[in-house]
Amino acid sequence: MKKEQYIKAVELLNLYSYHYYVLDDAITTDEVYDKLYHEVLEYEESHKEDILKNSPTQRVGDTVSEGFSKAPHLSRMWSLEDVFDSDGLQKWLIKTYKLDSNISFYCEPKYDGASLNLIYENGELSQAITRGDGEVGELITQNVKTIRSVPLSIEHKEKIEIRGEVVIFKDEFEKINQTRLKDGEALFANPRNAAAGSLRQLDSSITASRNLVFLPYGVGENFLEHKLLSQKMEYIYSLGFKKPPFCATCKDFNEIEAVYQEMSRNRDSYPMMLDGMVVKVDEIAAQIDMGYTVKNPRFSVAYKFPAVEKITTIKEIILQVGRTGAVTPVAIVEPTNIDGVVVERATLHNFDEIQRKDIRINDHVIILRSGDVIPKIIKVLTHERDGSEVEYKRPTICPVCESELLDEGVLLKCQNLTCEARVINSIIYFASKPCLNIDGLGVKIVEALFNSGLVKSVVDLFDLTLEKLLTLEGFKEKKAQNLLDALGSAKGCEYWRFVNSLGIEHIGEVASKTLSAKFGSGFIDATKDEIVACDGVGEEMAESLLEFIRVNRETILKLQNILKPLEPLQRQEAKENPFKGKSVVLTGSMSESRDMIKEMLESLGAKVVSSVSKKTDFVIYGEDAGSKYDKAMDLGVECLNEDEMRSKIEQA
């Protein structure tokens, strides 16, 4: 093969690939493609200096990365405002028409996958970046080059950002999970997770094997001169990108609603997962004039599909025991596919819920799955009962340790402090990030430690040695030493972390900080009156704390002696400033970690809380501020961005 023949062969292979992967219209056989592919490969092996960047051989993932570097987007990747029904759409249209009444709309599917930004320079794919925080994402160019529907080169020489969603088709998702099942690997929960996980593989050959598909939905930085978004997108598709299964231009609410209803009805027939329809103002000039809010473009909205409901059957009701001993019922149902996710469990909340809804084993029920929330039973189909249904009897003994349960009405509790489920969940909580943040103490390792007899309580963790850990399956010297080092690093922790790690019912992070600041190690001898006098600590919290200390005093003292948590320094009275004595909520991504900003505000005398209410004085918001920002605006709470917050501090 000569160089001219090689160039033509690459062009032909790319044409074959385009018809097969983008148009779904094969124009040759696998045999012809494979033969030509190997001829190109042979030429490239002996002429490395001639290898073209858009050669299909350059797609094959065979390199292992040590990690991904960060890269900025040329222009921000925005999130969209959501509406969930026709009333929500009407309200959005009214707002939009106030900005410009002479507009039309472009409607397209809202794909349920992983967002991706492609940057082309001089017609070549130069960077592929995950969405990240909208400003900066992870650079995954090598992995993305393995996606057949991403052109390595395009007939457009100016720099351009092409945004889209990476998805896995439903049938491909089933094949991947079947393979993982055979190989004894954990199954992916849904196609979205599979797509996101596949994109971020350090070994790009794994990405290549997953048959990912890239579907463009817009552009970022560009120098295109089209007057309409619909025209701009047709141009993008003409560059070799896959078209959506459905798109339309609409004049008004009625046309948009008709397109939405059709798309919603047919959603199961599309090869990829969809979770709604995106509506955008079609006129580019109007988009520019409308601009953006803090969070979203004003010219676009995501019209979400309704939550999905399915009928299934309750096979059994099992009990789960948490770290505090609370026993929770869970319904095991016939495996049911809801929008690409196989549901096998549904929450029952508590035993009163079972009685209220008269839920029985073998009942036919309607379950609802909304977003990533655990499915719940919304209706029992009593008219379908045939006599095989079995009433569920309220349990009296713990399903794990068989000790007698304490019946508190709505709540049932196991009081056995050595109950396996309580111990395991207590250790997991003890090691979690808001507590002692001990790396390497995940569920499986904690279970292995407990089942081996090495750890029967939190205190036992600190009796572990290298020799003991090496007796466990899967533990080699490095892994064992890393765990011992992590346990050692927990010593000398902040006192509030120690209090929080005890897992006292009703005593969370905020209360732990309050109690630690007030009493330090003296919290163990504090009286009820002293505890209730603390800001934000009520009667129920005080009683829970005192009962925990009564039962676990010896364990608390042992842990305190082992960990030697640092006594809180007596914080000097903060000088007068706008945040002193104020209730503050943080939301969104900021220039520094949320913990650092929280610590700074607390040093100024602010009380940083997790939820917005009428009592909230300030909401500090960053990029992609969520529902907390919206609630604050509704309640009239003063909202400050990070720069405004710092300006207030400097002016004080």
Swiss-Prot record:
Catalytic center residues: 110
Binding-site list for NAD(+): 30-34, 79-80, 108, 131, 165, 280, 304
InterPro entries: BRCT_dom, BRCT_dom_sf, DisA/LigA_HHH, DNA_ligase, DNAligase_adenylation, DNAligase_N, Hlx-hairpin-Hlx_DNA-bd_motif, NA-bd_OB-fold
Keyword terms, alphabetized: DNA damage, DNA repair, DNA replication, Ligase, Magnesium, Manganese, Metal-binding, NAD, Zinc
GO BP term (any one): DNA replication
Domain BRCT: 574-652
GO cellular component terms given for this protein: cytosol
Keyword field contains Calcium: no
Key word DNA damage present: yes
Cofactor requirement: Mg(2+); Mn(2+)
Catalysed reaction equations from the record: NAD(+) + (deoxyribonucleotide)n-3'-hydroxyl + 5'-phospho-(deoxyribonucleotide)m = (deoxyribonucleotide)n+m + AMP + beta-nicotinamide D-nucleotide
Binding residues annotated for Zn(2+), in chain numbering: 398, 401, 414, 419
EC assignment: 6.5.1.2
Domain of life assignment: Bacteria
GO molecular function: DNA binding; DNA ligase (NAD+) activity; metal ion binding
Family: Belongs to the NAD-dependent DNA ligase family. LigA subfamily.
Chain's role: DNA ligase that catalyzes the formation of phosphodiester linkages between 5'-phosphoryl and 3'-hydroxyl groups in double-stranded DNA using NAD as a coenzyme and as the energy source for the reaction. It is essential for DNA replication and repair of damaged DNA.
Xref: HAMAP family: DNA_ligase_A
Protein name as catalogued: DNA ligase
Originating organism: Sulfurimonas denitrificans (strain ATCC 33889 / DSM 1251) (Thiomicrospira denitrificans (strain ATCC 33889 / DSM 1251))
